[in-house]
Amino acid sequence: MKHLFILLFLLTTNAFAQGPFGDYAVVKDKDGYVNIRAKENVKSKIVDTLPNNTLVYGFFDKEFNPTNWIEVDKGYVHQSRLKKIFDFRAIEGKVQGNSLVFDDKDVKVTITKQKFDKTKHKITKKEHDGWTELIIDGKAIYGIDIYGGNDDSLPEDHYKSITVTMKGKNVPIPKSAYDDLYQIFYFSSSVYYDKEAEVLYILAHNSENASAYEVCWQIVKGEYKGRVIGYPL
């Protein structure tokens, strides 16, 4: 089953992305933090730091990033101070009814999607120079970039719920963590667990072509910390 999920993951990510996706990684340094440099150089000015287990997104592949540096909000961090989430323990998943369930002795994650019902949402639009943005329930959304003004331009589906249990305790995931995400690709979801730090990562690649995106949610010691959205090149 694990190999099936990996195969489906590779097939879907290659199929819907216009370019390669980056990787999610976290800070793992013996000092407990990593320096953010102003430029891609160890002698460059230190502008800030990131503590261990800070989630970042970047391009590690030498074909697309020939340096050993990953760009973050305020500058650059060295790749050697980061660990990809794929290197943590993967939790196997399986379909149960309308849900995708990842379950082992420490963690259980249930991801449920549902069809988009336009009668239950407020649909508006925002005009830009040469294109129209779709706004749903007052929020900019992920999964559809250009709104054509008809039902064919509306999303097909979205997340209904994401529930997480860690060591038998429920972890509340706010609706705001996923209610702006659309065009869900079930079999591109994966879950990884850093047992030592008690950190859970839920990763999904959704939509296709120019609207493709990925998201990683992070739960630290039974508390939802946030998400990072990534885009292909």
Ranges and model annotations:
Residues 18-37:
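Short N-terminal segments immediately surrounding and downstream of signal-peptide cleavage
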Residues 40-45:
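Short alpha-helix capping/helix-loop boundary micro-motifs
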Residues 19-25, 46-82:
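SH3/SH3-like beta-barrel superfamily modules
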Residues 76-143:
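Surface-exposed beta-loop interaction hotspot
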Residues 173-215, 220:
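Acidic, glycine-rich flexible loop segments
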Residues 136-185:
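Mature extracytoplasmic domains of secretory-pathway proteins
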Residues 3-13:
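Sec-dependent N-terminal signal peptides
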Residues 218-233:
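Short, low-complexity, Pro/Ser/Thr/Gly-rich segments in the mature regions of secreted, periplasmic
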